[in-house]
C-alpha cells in the first residue's frame, strides 16, 4: 500500500492547483485511435508537398510508378504458370495488402467484409470470442479479453501470444488476417492456441463464437467514504453518453471523489475519449492534439460547452493493457493535474489510424498522425508511468477479472475460487481518502 504522507503530497500537487487557462477556439474532427480489433472512421485529407519542387512533380512521380506497377501486373497476369491466383483483381489486392502492411502494424488494406466488421465493432456489437489484439514483434499479442466473453470465461489472459487458430500456425501474421480467422458465425467453434510467457507454456482454448455486445461503462458504484468507482472497458460510440449518465447517478448519491478504471482498456474512438475528458475540462480548454506529417495537419481537440466541469479528486487505474484512447484520457487528466494515475505502466500506443472507405466497398486503415497531451508529450512506444506504482501478478489479475466480470462467483469455472482484494483499487482509495482529508472534505 502506498505511503499515506507521500500520497497526500502527490495529490496536493495534483489537485490543489489552479486550473489551466482555457483556450479560445474549437476544433472537432471524427478520428480513430485504433487498438487491434477496435476500429472506426475519420476523414483524412492530405496536402502533397515537396521542398522547392514544382506542384506537378508529385503527380509525375506517382504516374511513373503507376506505369511501372501496371507493367509488372500485366507481365505476371500473362506469363505466370503457378497455382496462385493471377487474375488482375487478386494480384492488385495482394499488392495493396503488401504495400500497406509493410508501413506499420496498425495500417492495413481491408476487404469489404473486413471493412464492414470494423464498422460493426464501433456500434458495440460483433461476432467473435471477445479478444482484442495487437501486432508486436511479428507476434499477435492479446491486449485484453473482453469481460464476460467466451475468451475471458475460458481463462485467456492479457499478454498471451496467439500462435495457432484451429491448429494452423500463424505464419507471418497480420491483424486483419488473424481477426478474420477468429471471427465466424454465432455458435460455431474455434480453437485458439496461445503461448503464455509468464508460465512458459502453450494452452489450447476451444471457444464457441457468440454475439459480443459491449457495455463500455460498467460497475458504477459508490464505495466507502463516498468515493465513486466505474470501469470503462473500451471507447465506442456511446461511451461519452454512458459515462455522463453514470457520473450523474453517482453524484446524486453523494459522490466526493472518483476512481476511473481503465485497466485492460484497449482504446477505441478518439471522440469518445474526448467526451470522457470533457466532463472535467472547462469549455474551449485543450484536451489533446494530433499531429500529422506536415505542420498544417495539427488538429487541436478542445472541450465542448454545454455542461459544467467537475472538479472533485480523481484517480485513474491503469496497467499494461491500457492503450490508445484510454491512454489519451489518462495522459490528458494527468498532464493538467486533474487526476493521479495508479497502477502499472500503460501499453504505449499513441498513433491515429484513419479508416477510409474505398469506392468498391473495401477499406484502408492508415496511420495518419500521432497524438499528444496538452503539454506536447507523446506516449507512443513509451506509455504512461503511474504516479503511484502498484504491480499485480498475472495470476491475481486473472482472478480479479473473474470477480469483475462475474460478481456471482458461483459460476466461475475455476475450482475452489476464493475472492481476493484488488490492491490497486485499494491504493487508489487510499490516495483519494488522503486528498479529501487534506482539502477538509
Describe the residue ranges of each PLM region.
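Terminal targeting/pro-maturation regions of precursor/exported proteins
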Residues: 15-107, 140, 431, 435-441
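Residue-level signature of catalytic and energy-coupling elements of molecular machines
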Residues: 72, 95, 131, 192, ...
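Extended, small/polar residue-biased N-terminal targeting/export presequences
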Residues: 77-143, 189-191, 195-219, 423-432, ...
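Conserved functional hotspot residues or short segments at active or partner-binding sites
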Residues: 363, 370-441
Amino acid at each position: 500500500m502506498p505511503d499515506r504522507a507521500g500520497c497526500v503530497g502527490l495529490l496536493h500537487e495534483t489537485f490543489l492547483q489552479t486550473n489551466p487557462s482555457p483556450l479560445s477556439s474549437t476544433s472537432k474532427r471524427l478520428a480513430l485511435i485504433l487498438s487491434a480489433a477496435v476500429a472506426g472512421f475519420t476523414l483524412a485529407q492530405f496536402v502533397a508537398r515537396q521542398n522547392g519542387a514544382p506542384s506537378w512533380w508529385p503527380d509525375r512521380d506517382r504516374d511513373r510508378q503507376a506505369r511501372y506497377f501496371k507493367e509488372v501486373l500485366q507481365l505476371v497476369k500473362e506469363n505466370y504458370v503457378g497455382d496462385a491466383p493471377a487474375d488482375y483483381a487478386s494480384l492488385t489486392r495482394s499488392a495493396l495488402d503488401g504495400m500497406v502492411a509493410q508501413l506499420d502494424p496498425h495500417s492495413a488494406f481491408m476487404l469489404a467484409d473486413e471493412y464492414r466488421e470494423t464498422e460493426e465493432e464501433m456500434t458495440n456489437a460483433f461476432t467473435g470470442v471477445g479478444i482484442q489484439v495487437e501486432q508486436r514483434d511479428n507476434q499477435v499479442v492479446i491486449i485484453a479479453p473482453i469481460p464476460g466473453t467466451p475468451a475471458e470465461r475460458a481463462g485467456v489472459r492479457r499478454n498471451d501470444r496467439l500462435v495457432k487458430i484451429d491448429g494452423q500456425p500463424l505464419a507471418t501474421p497480420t491483424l486483419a488476417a488473424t481477426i478474420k480467422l477468429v471471427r465466424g458465425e454465432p455458435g460455431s467453434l474455434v480453437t485458439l492456441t496461445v503461448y503464455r510467457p509468464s508460465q512458459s507454456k502453450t494452452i489450447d482454448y476451444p471457444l464457441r463464437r457468440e454475439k459480443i455486445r459491449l457495455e463500455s461503462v460498467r460497475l458504477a458504484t459508490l464505495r466507502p467514504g463516498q468515493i465513486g468507482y466505474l470501469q470503462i472497458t473500451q471507447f465506442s460510440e456511446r461511451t461519452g453518453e454512458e459515462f455522463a449518465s453514470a457520473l450523474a447517478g453517482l453524484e446524486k448519491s453523494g459522490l466526493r471523489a472518483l476512481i476511473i478504471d481503465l485497466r485492460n482498456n484497449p482504446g477505441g474512438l478518439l471522440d469518445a475519449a474526448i467526451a470522457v475528458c470533457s466532463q472535467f475540462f472547462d469549455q474551449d480548454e485543450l484536451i489533446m492534439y494530433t499531429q500529422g506529417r506536415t505542420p498544417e495537419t495539427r488538429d487541436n481537440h478542445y472541450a465542448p460547452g454545454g455542461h459544467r466541469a467537475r472538479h472533485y479528486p480523481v484517480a485513474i487505474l491503469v496497467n499494461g493493457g491500457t492503450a490508445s484512447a484510454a491512454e489519451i484520457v489518462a495522459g490528458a487528466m494527468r498532464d493538467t493535474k486533474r487526476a493521479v494515475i495508479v497502477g502499472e505502466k500503460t501499453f504505449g500506443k499513441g498513433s491515429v489510424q484513419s479508416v477510409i472507405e474505398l469506392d468498391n466497398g473495401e477499406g484502408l486503415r492508415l496511420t495518419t498522425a500521432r497524438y499528444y497531451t496538452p503539454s506536447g508529450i507523446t506516449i507512443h512506444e513509451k506509455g504512461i508511468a503511474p504516479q503511484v506504482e502498484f504491480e499485480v501478478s498475472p495470476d491475481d489479475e486473472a482472478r480479479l477479472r473473474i470477480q469483475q466480470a462475474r460478481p456471482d462467483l458461483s459460476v466461475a469455472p475455476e475450482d475452489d475460487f476464493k475472492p481476493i482484494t484488488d490492491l490497486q483499487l485499494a491504493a487508489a482509495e487510499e490516495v483519494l481518502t488522503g486528498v479529501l482529508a487534506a482539502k477538509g472534505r
